[in-house]
């Protein structure tokens, strides 16, 4: 689920219009023909042979998003252990200035968790969450689609290419 700023000028104008249609006040699925513009890059980067199932949702807040990837043991062929997935992610992102793996939650904490989409708005931060059990895991990342998205990534990459600290202008 994403804020509407990533939808382009037309979507921004529709949602910010004082005369906007009632359906624009609630989350909306789009890209339902499985032809979203980011599918080719998702397939390539993930190494998938076939397009992934991608169900983007846009809501009426400006920026921020949560991206979730469900993984089922029966389909993946892997034995799922949330603790091992958590540890792997923590090792991978250890020392990262911008990506933070959140502590694994107990089943009771997972039941009580409400994962909002725009808590990291106006930042270049990303939080990764692991939910689930041995049968299925839900991997979620929360970020600002602008800050950690295209604009933040551009500044971070420019900093690295110029030999600057990657955090310049982003913290």
Show where each model-derived region lies.
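C-terminal substrate-binding/catalytic lobe of Rossmann-fold NAD(P)-dependent oxidoreductases
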Residues: 2-139
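NAD(P)-dependent Rossmann-like dehydrogenase/reductase catalytic/cofactor-binding core
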Residues: 125-171
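Short alpha-helical "patches" and their helix-cap loops
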Residues: 1, 83, 167-171
